[in-house]
Curated annotation (Swiss-Prot):
Pathway: Amino-acid biosynthesis; L-proline biosynthesis; L-glutamate 5-semialdehyde from L-glutamate: step 2/2. It comes from the Bacteria. The keyword NADP applies. It is found in: Cytoplasm. GO terms for biological process: L-proline biosynthetic process. GO terms for cellular component: cytoplasm. This is Gamma-glutamyl phosphate reductase. It comes from Thermus thermophilus (strain ATCC 27634 / DSM 579 / HB8).
Length: 413
């Protein structure tokens, strides 16, 4: 598609922004949940066509996993929609209202960001989750999904249009770029009508958007996530957290990629970890200190400690203590999700305070870095940059604040 036609799509969406913010957005979310339940087979049929083509073209297993919609996804998506609908409206509230000496009352009002461009790879569930979050906050969305999920996305956007119609909202609130041409990504990056761009996908996509964008970018970058097993850890708990983080769904950004083990518990813990991971088909790649304690692990290369596998591969490193664990995470982590397993509150609180990540956990799985699990209903992504949001981005993170002043005829002297 041409840059001109993309501009026209965006311009039509912008013109309806005020209608979206003032309209019955919760009704649209509830209508979408009902439509998904009634028409899920249509969506699955489109998804199967995408999967068949992706398999023919040799799409990697990790991407096939993200592309596939399953029966259980229906419950997750509909629960997320209904949970977001129940959340308080983030718009219109005035925060910090204070009276000045001259009687003028000033505060800051929550308003939508505006028109959001969302560029994402083969993950059709995001077409529901991301739109629901943006819509709750009164924003319009211009979507450019991965070519592998084009049929799935088209089917889901068609349902969104029906839901918007039932709620009396304009279809332009959700617009799918009608092409799989990669040039459309570059055109969106140059589209100055957008208020924000959110890329969600691999490193290559994120870097491309950050490099080419002419508007602000909120990046959902890779998840090089660690679990530190402290010397005072409950080792049975640590084993459960490692298994859940790595094997429940290895191809997602909050999956576990590295286990750091205190040297005082390494001999007791690592053989148990290897046995459990081997039963799940996980390959271990270990540091020189860990290798003698493991039967089938292979040496970890120095250049892979900052790699996101999104697969059944797990790195293991023995560390001298909390200090070395913190240094390793600071060097190789991606500011996504980090966890500590310990019964020592002092060590835990130091970890929580010093680790720089969008979610830091104590005695819990990295898999909890998710909008639904954290009570946001859903998320548009997990921001690993600190401006303008950090961590899972729910409706509140897709608003901004404008100053308002309530007067009684005051003039400046």
């Amino acid at each position: 598609m041409t840059a001109t036609s993309l501009w026209e799509l965006a311009e039509r969406a912008r013109k309806r922004l005020s209608e979206i913010a003032k309209g019955n957005r919760d009704r649209a979310l509830l209508a979408m949940a009902d439509l998904l339940e009634a028409r899920w087979e249509e969506v699955l049929r489109a998804n199967r066509e995408d999967l068949e083509e992706a398999e023919r073209t040799g799409l990697p297993k990790a991407k096939l996993d993200r592309l596939a919609l399953k029966e259980k996804d229906l419950k997750t998506l509909t629960e997320g929609l209904r949970q977001i609908a129940r959340l308080p409206d983030p718009l219109g509230r005035i925060e910090g209202l204070a009276k000045r000496p001259n009687g003028l009352r000033v505060g800051r009002m929550r308003v939508p960001l505006g028109l959001i461009g969302f560029i994402y790879e083969a993950r059709p569930g995001a077409t529901v989750e991301a739109v629901s979050v943006a819509l709750k906050a009164g924003n319009a969305m211009l979507l450019r999904g991965g070519k592998e999920a084009f049929r799935s996305n088209r089917a889901l956007v068609a349902l969104w249009h029906e839901a918007l119609g039932e709620a009396g909202l304009p279809e332009e609130a959700v617009t799918l770029v009608p092409t799989t041409d990669r040039e459309a990504v570059l055109e969106m990056c140059r589209l100055e009508l957008l208020d924000l761009l959110i890329p969600r996908g691999g490193e290559e996509l994120i870097r491309l958007v950050q490099r080419e964008a002419r508007v602000p970018v909120l990046a959902h970058a890779k998840g090089v996530n660690h679990l530190y097993v402290d010397k005072k850890a409950d080792l049975s708990m640590a084993l459960r957290l490692a298994l859940n983080g790595k094997t429940q769904r290895p191809a997602v950004c909050n999956a576990l990629e590295t286990v750091l083990v205190h040297e005082k518990v390494a001999e007791a813990f690592l053989p148990r970890l290897e046995k459990a991971m081997r039963e799940k088909g996980v390959e271990l790649r270990a540091c020189p200190r860990a290798l003698p304690l493991l039967k089938e692990a292979v040496p970890a290369r120095e250049d892979e400690w900052d790699r996101e596998y999104l697969d059944l591969v797990l790195r293991v490193k023995v560390v001298s203590g909390l200090e070395e664990a913190l240094a390793h995470i600071a060097r190789y982590g991606s500011r996504h999700t980090e966890a500590i397993c310990t019964e020592d509150p002092k060590a835990a609180w130091r970890f929580l305070e010093e680790v720089d990540a969008s979610l830091v956990l104590w005695n819990a799985s990295t898999r909890f870095n998710d909008g639904f699990e954290l009570g946001l209903g859903a998320e548009i992504g997990i921001s690993t940059s600190k401006l303008h949001a950090y961590g899972p981005m729910g409706p509140m993170e897709l608003t901004t604040l404008k100053w308002v002043a309530l007067g009684e005829g005051q003039e400046r002297t």
